[in-house]
């Protein structure tokens, strides 16, 4: 269960207390591709404040503590951090610079170049395939600085509802055949059909298809849509209301089929039910 738009530091505990075991936050860049703040901006989801924010490096310092065992702030349930990268607000020519910058800030403030025991997995949410140079830069940077092993903790996800074969082609260009999630969804204000979601799930379940390991639906607020997504077999949901998802998961239809992922589960492995 991914808590959606958790951009203020005080919201982290708020969403974890509602039952989320993953959080998504938005990263806003300046015109040169430097990550500045966690901030969504207007417009955003119905019934949500769009303007909450924090300085990105301060957010990382806090979330490092929340995901470090034995730290006073540690919350065991938080296993995945989804970085919603607002690359559509900057020139595609700056995507590589942005990837370098985000990777360096994670190296310095989250992983602390080997001195941190923070353990969450990282999911890079890329809005459009045209920004794929961000991924190349993000993977190059730890490698160039002697910390390539951190790339094992990082997954890729394209969030713009683009053609799945087009996404596969870009992953092929990048040489990525593992650690790939696929999102499908729309703002909670609008309805969305299931055609593309079903296609993504079908590809995930195709033997030998290495370009989708997990599929999640976003942003779900109505229990009926949560049930619909679970019946289709999604691996996760993003929601403004994690507590509602928890209630649905406890229903007789789902209680024996689904459980919340823990740190012992590998987010890059296909689940074989």
UniProtKB/Swiss-Prot annotation:
Q: Which CDD domains match?
A: GDPD_like_SMaseD_PLD (cd08576)
Chief location bin: secreted
* Listed transmembrane segments: none
Q: What is its EC number?
A: 4.6.1.-
* Entry keyword set: Cytolysis, Dermonecrotic toxin, Disulfide bond, Hemolysis, Lipid degradation, Lipid metabolism, Lyase, Magnesium, Metal-binding, Secreted, Toxin
Please give the InterPro entries that the UniProt record associates with this protein: PLC-like_Pdiesterase_TIM-brl
Q: Which cysteines are joined by disulfide bonds?
A: 44-50, 46-189
Cofactor requirement:
Mg(2+)
Gene Ontology biological process terms, A to Z: killing of cells of another organism; lipid catabolic process
Active-site residues? 4, 40 (nucleophile)
Would you tell me the Gene Ontology cellular component terms? Answer: extracellular region
UniProt: Mg(2+) binding residues = 24, 26, 84
According to its UniProt record, where is this protein located?
A: Secreted
Q: In which tissues is it expressed?
A: Expressed by the venom gland.
How the cofactor is bound: the record states: Binds 1 Mg(2+) ion per subunit.
Any one GO molecular-function label of the UniProt entry: phosphoric diester hydrolase activity
Q: What reaction does this enzyme carry out catalytically?
A: an N-(acyl)-sphingosylphosphocholine = an N-(acyl)-sphingosyl-1,3-cyclic phosphate + choline; an N-(acyl)-sphingosylphosphoethanolamine = an N-(acyl)-sphingosyl-1,3-cyclic phosphate + ethanolamine; a 1-acyl-sn-glycero-3-phosphocholine = a 1-acyl-sn-glycero-2,3-cyclic phosphate + choline; a 1-acyl-sn-glycero-3-phosphoethanolamine = a 1-acyl-sn-glycero-2,3-cyclic phosphate + ethanolamine
Q: What protein family is recorded?
A: Belongs to the arthropod phospholipase D family. Class II subfamily.
Provide the function of this protein: Dermonecrotic toxins cleave the phosphodiester linkage between the phosphate and headgroup of certain phospholipids (sphingolipid and lysolipid substrates), forming an alcohol (often choline) and a cyclic phosphate. This toxin acts on sphingomyelin (SM). It may also act on ceramide phosphoethanolamine (CPE), lysophosphatidylcholine (LPC) and lysophosphatidylethanolamine (LPE), but not on lysophosphatidylserine (LPS), and lysophosphatidylglycerol (LPG). It acts by transphosphatidylation, releasing exclusively cyclic phosphate products as second products.
From the Swiss-Prot or TrEMBL record, give the protein name: Dermonecrotic toxin SdSicTox-betaIIB1bxi
């Amino acid at each position: 269960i991914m808590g959606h738009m958790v951009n203020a530091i005080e919201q982290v505990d708020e969403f974890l207390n509602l039952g989320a075991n993953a959080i998504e936050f938005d990263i806003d860049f300046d015109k040169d591709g430097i990550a500045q703040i966690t901030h969504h901006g207007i417009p955003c989801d119905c019934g949500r404040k769009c303007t909450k924010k924090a300085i990105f490096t301060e957010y990382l310092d806090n979330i490092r503590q929340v995901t470090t065992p034995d730290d006073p702030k540690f919350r065991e349930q938080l296993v995945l951090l989804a970085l919603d990268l607002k690359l559509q607000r900057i020139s595609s020519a700056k995507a590589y610079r942005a990837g370098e910058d985000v990777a360096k800030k994670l190296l310095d403030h989250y992983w602390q170049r080997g001195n941190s025991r923070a353990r969450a997995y990282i999911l890079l949410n890329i809005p459009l395939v045209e920004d794929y140079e961000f991924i190349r830069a993000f993977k190059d940077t730890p490698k160039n600085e002697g910390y390539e092993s951190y790339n094992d903790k990082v997954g890729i996800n394209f969030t713009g509802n683009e053609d799945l074969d087009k996404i596969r082609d870009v992953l092929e260009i990048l040489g990525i055949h593992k650690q790939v999630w696929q999102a499908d969804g729309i703002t909670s204000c609008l309805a969305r059909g299931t055609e593309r979601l079903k296609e993504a799930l079908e590809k995930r379940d195709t033997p030998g298809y290495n370009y989708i390991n997990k599929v999640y639906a976003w942003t779900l607020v109505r229990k009926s849509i949560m049930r619909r997504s679970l019946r289709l077999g999604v691996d996760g949901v993003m929601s403004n209301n994690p507590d509602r998802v928890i209630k649905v998961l406890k229903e007789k239809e789902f209680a024996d089929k689904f459980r919340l992922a823990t740190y012992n589960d590998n987010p890059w492995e296909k689940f074989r039910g």
